[in-house]
Amino acid sequence: MPRRTDIKKVLLIGSGPIQIGQAAEFDFSGSQACKSLREEGIEVVLVNSNPATIQTDPETADTIYIEPLRASIIAKIIEKEKPDGILSGMGGQTGLNLTAELAELGALRNVEILGTPLEAIYQGEDREKFKALMQKIGEPVPRSMILNRLDQLGEVIEKVGLPVIIRPAYTLGGAGGGIAHTVDELKRIVEIGLQRSRIHQVLIEESVMGWKELEFEVMRDAKDTCVIICSMENVDPMGVHTGESVVVAPILTLRDDEYQMMRSASIKIIRALDVQGGCNIQFAFQDGDYRVIEVNPRVSRSSALASKATGYPIARVAAKIAIGMHLDEITNAVTGCTPASFEPSIDYVVVKVPRWPFDKFTRADRTLTTAMKSTGEVMAIGRTLEEGFKKALRSIDTDINTHTNHNEIRMILTSPTDERFGCIFDAFREGFTVDEIASLTSINPFFLHKMENIVKIERTLATEPTDLRIQEAAAAGFSMKEIAELTGRPVDEVRTAAGDPVYKMVDTCAAEFPATTPYYYSTHGVTTDIIQNDKKKVLILGSGPIRIGQGIEFDYCTVHAVKALREEGVEVHIVNNNPETVSTDFDTSDQLFFEPMQLEDVVNILKTDDYFGVMVQFGGQNAVNLALPLLQEIKKLGLPTAILGSSPDAMDIAEDRDRFSELLDALKIPSPPNSSAYSEEAALAMANKIGFPVLVRPSYVLGGRAMEIVHDNFELESYMKEAMRVSKSHPVLIDSFLQEAIELDVDAVCDGDEVLIGGIMEHIEEAGVHSGDSACVIPTQSLSDSVLARVREYTKKIAMGLGVVGLVNIQLAVKDDIVYVLEANPRASRTVPFVSKATGIPLAKVAAKVMIGKKLKDLGYKERTFRHVAVKEVLLPFNKLPGVDTVLGPEMKSTGEVMGIDYDFGRAYYKACISADNELPIEGNVFISVSTEQKEEVRRIAAQLRDLGLTLFGTKGTVETLMQAGIEANLVRKVQEGSPNVIDMVRKGEIRLIINTPVDKQSRLDHYQIMRAAVDYGIPYITTLQAARAAALAIDAIKREKITLEPISHYLSEVE
């Protein structure tokens, strides 16, 4: 049937900040859904707390609220906007949970849940109901028991036995779950799982570890038409969360009759659940037998992968189904001529590999279980599985350690960690057999034989470096650089022997029909599908997998650059390998290349056409690092392509501390005393000359990797080893650390003649906390007009001095009324989306236009003033990564961000804290423990909290300090002093807020245990006095005045 005419206005709930288990895939699906609904003339109201999303752009939805994703707040938005329907399945687990909560609140009495009905959500998410439904329709599930209380553990052990898998209901990325082999492990995981579950329910399930894990992505409409979009197979067996596993599409290890059995089961399950839209179904399979593991009655991480793997726009189709359309009425937008009821067909192999944050968190537990730890993923496409594996490993952009010790290899293979996939290749190099590795890993021998083939090719290249062998290696996904190293032949000679790659098309139909929105992958030995034209073309380098320090913000900038260039009539191509993002959606660019982001891959694309230019400044640090080598290759090959925007030399000046210091001296701009060193000895000499404490950091790295504040020679010696390791060919930078300074960020655009300042952000955290981890506010709250005038002056001088064309981010610090410049980055920064949303200036779009020759004076933008206050706060991943130090410092740890907006700082900060899952209490008990040097300052904060009606608790030193000032506080034991202590109070739910600022080693040890408890039990915690001061202001504001609930357009309409 045609779309329903009674649905005129739809509310879509976004997924909030990027976090482990819920990344950019929901911006991709939500944006696609908004576009799909508006194509049908439906008004879309969107609510999301994440400013770094395309879906919160003014052109994506009709009305946009950047507000905390809380049922009570969304209920008020529903009351105000009066939508006819709500679309819950595009916001991930967050969207589903909120829809269920809104229904339970009674907020959906006059609002229809579109697509998948509420009962299907309950049956898919509530473990007990799901198990009952599967048993009713005769589908096998693992032997299991539902738990709601800890005292049921004895019964579990009796009925299910050990080991078991624990799966909490209504949680994200397996959060709170795990595998228990002992009673103690079971008790610990269940306690946290019950806490994390929205309905305090966990499923205890018999272990099917070692079985194959299979996934089917299914689509169904109201007419009961079902299509299988994609089948996927995890290389890692059951026991590793699918988000943590290497995944292959399509399924390659089942016989046809087995595949048809699983296909039929998938359709039977989606029909029983009455899902209308997309649905992901996971199975365990072994020797012709299977178990249904779980169902996601929504678009998911796997949906994004299936969508990109096949070219089938799952979210677009699901949104149209939600408003009553049938699959045979919906046109496949990729082909433009086939209906969405045609099942996709693919003639290639897709490989997904997760990206883990262990390069940042070296002390974290690296074991892979049923709870997610990865931050992002890459996707590679090849004609063979070998080619897919090799291209995926090149895409992942992380150091892969080599192992030669056989005992070490056996240990890694037996216990799954992030190192296991790479270590399998080491095992083959060391002579292990397929059977040995299969018995250690339970990985299907089919995959192991393919991996063994790759190692055999390596050996053949070394012993027989002929042109034929080189061509075979190129077809198997080996890079030219790798082949050159293995053969001992020069790279240029290898390239000539291998020949240039060709590009094949992803079109949903194995080339049966022509595609109108093509995207491509490279391979060797076949004909190319690329069709050239005479249009002016630009290639934009994407940002690759989401990782700490390089998140969705850079994809946001990439998409904005595409839109800006297309507005100017330029044909835009993107190269990226992240299946979760909007930039890799089928219709974002004119052409998309799903490729590794290495130099030779980018150069190969440039050789396919006469590109006018290539843009590197929107893809984050990794893309910027390619600027100089890319320029050299372009010159060497005589390509007609320019690096658009700021020159590679300008980028080098900004990264090279000596050159940048010379520029600041020439411009008469103050900077902290600093130097650079290539050795430990030189670093010690420089640090002693500058004076401790100093900030040590490698150059040309992202997110403050290996950055530390060091206080003496001993600490410096330790940290230099890590700094030299991550930045081998570049100097280590040493800066005097400005204690108690106020840190600032400025985002600006320069066209070579003029500078547009987008926004000046004041950090809420102290100097020394990485800018990516600090909350910040626009406009600034504590700086004088004279200081801000100097900030503007220095920004303009540096932009002009560097010769910036495009974006520039400048970090500054203010101490004793002196403005110091810390660093400049002539590229997109992670704060660009926040500044753009807070001010209404689309900085990335402006920058892209400037980079192709437009002038700021003609574009009509100027720095703006406004009545509202916007606060950016970060989301930290400590609840997903046991073992990580929770103290904030100069190395970035956050995964995502949120924005709070209101008419004063207190309410804006309160909203930001709620959005970041750090809900500040307006009543109850507060625990405070600070260092001796901070006692004076904490008195003022404690007095304010007391006056606001909160009850204070603290350790001995802090309590004595407060009592001396006449502030009543209750004494609590330190952790090492035994029970009862603050951790016991946290477990009992007696503490509502923790303020703990550790300094020495013992207080850090206490702090870690306290923060770990806070994370596990969902208690807000604060680790700096600046944030504590801001929290007190927020609690004060929220007790005096209600938060404002207005769309972002309302605030921006008042901008001057």
Swiss-Prot record:
Residues in MGS-like domain copies = 918-1056
The residues that the entry says bind Mg(2+) 3 are 811, 823
Listed PROSITE patterns: ATP_GRASP (PS50975), CPSASE_1 (PS00866), CPSASE_2 (PS00867), MGS (PS51855)
Q: Where does Mn(2+) 3 bind?
A: 811, 823
Output the Pfam families linked to this UniProt entry.
CPSase_L_D2, CPSase_L_D3, MGS
Q: Where does Mg(2+) 4 bind?
A: 823, 825
Reactions listed under catalytic activity: hydrogencarbonate + L-glutamine + 2 ATP + H2O = carbamoyl phosphate + L-glutamate + 2 ADP + phosphate + 2 H(+)
Q: Which residues bind ATP 1?
A: 127, 167, 173-174, 206, 208, 213, 239-241, 282, 294
Q: In which pathway does it act?
A: Amino-acid biosynthesis; L-arginine biosynthesis; carbamoyl phosphate from bicarbonate: step 1/1; Pyrimidine metabolism; UMP biosynthesis via de novo pathway; (S)-dihydroorotate from bicarbonate: step 1/3
Describe the family membership recorded for this protein in Swiss-Prot or TrEMBL.
Belongs to the CarB family.
| Identification of the protein by name | Carbamoyl phosphate synthase large chain
Organism of origin is Methanosphaerula palustris (strain ATCC BAA-1556 / DSM 19958 / E1-9c)
Gene expressing this chain: carB
